[in-house]
Design a protein with these regions (language model features):
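Polytopic membrane enzymes that build or remodel cell-surface glycoconjugates and lipids
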Residues: 2-459, 492, 499-501, 525-556
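Intrinsic-disorder/low-complexity loop/linker signature
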Residues: 432, 474, 482, 508-509, ...
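Luminal/periplasmic acceptor-recognition loop/helix of membrane-associated glycosyltransferases
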Residues: 443-506
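Preference for solvent-exposed, low-hydrophobicity sequence contexts
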Residues: 496-527
Length: 556
């Protein structure tokens, strides 16, 4: 059976609506995103040669990202670091992904003879667009390759679907070229052949398309992709000595570390687990990660699989489509299981679920269509969508506030004269939204040069950073003598960071840091006379200069 599809005009309306919705939702965060890895990327593209940048030779990460690096190089030449241009680009790429996913699913539902195919597909993609889990990918320029990677997968699936409708060789050539490019981008291309295979099996054995078409899909799409994948692994091994890109030794984890993540992601995505109070969230993570929780979850999973196998031939077309989407969720889960699970802050590592979210919400919309009373179905999806939208707006306001503070700190940095600068409490993030952070090489100095366009020859040290919770957070200092001070966070529930992890004691030629309590305070010992330093405290969006002659009281 072949669906009739929708008109080009209706497609244009859907795309424009998705773009406009995404643009409006993320407009508050338009100036955010140029932080942490994004700033490092911008520094690389401005200071490395073309070939060093394209080959990502400075990163130290075992990955082949030449296609991604090349495309970002082109966009940089077009936009420089203009926040409005980059924000529009990221919004547009997400709108394209949402539309492609809608188009593929709508056609899939039509081909399957599912009633209200358009309404189901549009409901699923709207849930995806308004969910709060995708903000990191849309706002943070360093997540460009997630937008690109998912787009490449969707374009290939569209080629396969088109081939089933019209057996033209050009679709196989397009898919092969796209997959070749994707092997030099984000590693989610590992999954593409399996998405292709499951879609091909569905059209052959569920929709009963001719076996000769299925054979050609295997020969012209699936097998060439497997060969390109093997070629990628060979090149990766030859260049870096690793068989798996990017994550390397992260594969060597306890088995339970892998299997506890799927139930946690269900809580995280479907039930907005990240927005639960920390204690409640940890309790849920503990329960689903316990032996009893895992036994229950995987017993349910196995029973569901057994039911699918035993009843598949008797299922309705809608039921079989549910199975296809379910299989795509399982495939998408597989690649993120070795990665760190985001169990603490908001937004942090949400990019890992960008493509998984799409399948989850489309499946949810399809399941909701089983409710016979359409008004109840619409009401439930609307309420659920509005709850998601509420948290998305909340997250985007955090992006906005964090960007305001970061930009103010850069703009209002005092003239250091000829002194050594110590930045005692840089903001690492705002409840998970990345900000500046503390790096050995000097993150603040690099960002100051990039965004204020001034080069300061002085030594500027990122002493430590901390995670902000509110816009007014900061720290205070108690000066003991002319070479020793105690630095304490003003608020509880935050902690000290250094080089992207929990802070620790260290020293260099200009000072020694003694971390007393990673969640509250540290001692700082100066190695030179106090008048050789400019010591700065961050309070909200302001810098405060520490007076080393003012002793016996807290300085805020």
């Amino acid at each position: 059976m072949q669906g009739q599809g929708i008109t080009g005009k209706k497609n244009a309306v859907v795309f424009c609506a998705l773009w406009l919705l995404t643009f409006i939702i993320y407009l508050p965060a338009v100036k955010a995103g140029w932080v942490i890895d994004s700033a490092g990327w911008l520094n690389n593209i401005r200071n490395l040669s073309f070939w060093h940048y394209i080959n990502n030779s400075q990163s130290g990460i075992p990955s082949l990202y030449q296609f991604t690096q090349f495309t970002t190089y082109i966009f940089y030449k077009l936009f420089n670091a203009n926040p409005y241009a980059w924000h529009t680009l990221m919004v547009t790429m997400h709108a394209v992904n949402s539309f492609l996913f809608f188009f593929i699913c709508n056609r899939l539902f039509l081909d399957s003879g599912i009633k209200n195919a358009f309404n189901i597909a549009i409901a699923g993609v709207l849930l995806y667009t308004v969910c709060p889990h995708i903000s990191e990918v849309i706002v943070w320029e360093a997540a460009f390759h997630y937008l690109q990677g998912f787009m490449l997968i969707l374009l290939i699936l569209l080629c396969v679907q088109n081939f089933y409708h019209r057996q033209l060789k050009k679709y196989a050539w397009f898919a092969g070229l796209i997959y070749l490019c994707s092997t030099y981008s984000l590693e989610i291309f590992y999954l593409t052949p399996w998405f292709v295979l499951t879609l091909a099996l569905y059209y052959r054995y569920v929709l009963n398309y001719d076996h000769s078409i299925f054979r050609k899909v295997i020969q012209w799409f699936f097998i060439p992709q497997l060969l390109l994948f093997v070629l990628h692994i060979i090149v990766l091994k030859a260049v870096y000595g690793w068989f798996f890109a990017h994550i390397g030794e992260n594969l060597l984890q306890p088995f339970t570390s892998y299997i506890c993540k799927p139930p946690r992601y269900i809580f995280h995505i479907l039930f907005l687990g990240r927005f639960f109070p920390l204690d409640s969230r940890r309790q849920v993570y503990f329960i689903v990660g316990s032996n009893a929780g895992l036994i229950i979850f995987y017993n349910i999973f196995v029973l569901a699989c057994c039911y699918i196998v035993s009843r598949f031939t008797k299922m309705t077309m809608k039921g079989k489509t549910v199975v296809l989407l379910f299989s795509w969720i399982v495939i998408a889960q597989a690649i993120i299981m070795p990665l760190a699970f985001p169990d603490m802050l908001l937004v942090y590592f949400d990019r890992y679920t960008y493509f998984l979210d799409a399948f989850v919400y489309m499946l949810l919309a399809l399941l909701a269509s089983y409710i016979t009373n359409k008004y109840i179905s619409i009401a439930l999806l609307t309420v659920y969508g509005l709850i998601n939208l509420y948290f998305t707006v909340k997250v985007n306001l955090l992006w906005k506030h964090s960007a305001y503070i970061t930009n103010r700190l850069l703009k209002n940095f005092p003239d250091p004269g000829n002194k050594i600068v110590l930045l005692l409490d840089l903001p690492q993030n705002m409840d998970g939204i990345p900000m500046i952070g503390a790096e050995k090489e000097g993150q603040f100095k690099m960002m100051y040069k990039l965004f204020v366009n001034k080069n300061i020859p002085n030594k500027i040290y990122d002493v430590v950073a901390y995670n902000m919770i509110t816009r007014d957070d900061g720290a205070h200092v108690w000066v003991h003598n002319d070479s020793l001070m105690k630095v304490t966070l003003n608020q509880w529930g935050t902690w000290w960071w250094y080089v992207g992890h929990g802070a620790y004691s260290y020293e260099n030629e200009d000072y020694k840091l003694d971390m007393k309590d990673m969640g509250h305070w540290y001692d700082l010992h100066l190695k030179h006379p106090a008048d050789q330093y400019l010591i700065l405290l961050q309070q909200g969006d302001q810098w405060k200069i520490v007076n080393m002659k003012k002793r016996g009281e807290d300085q805020y």
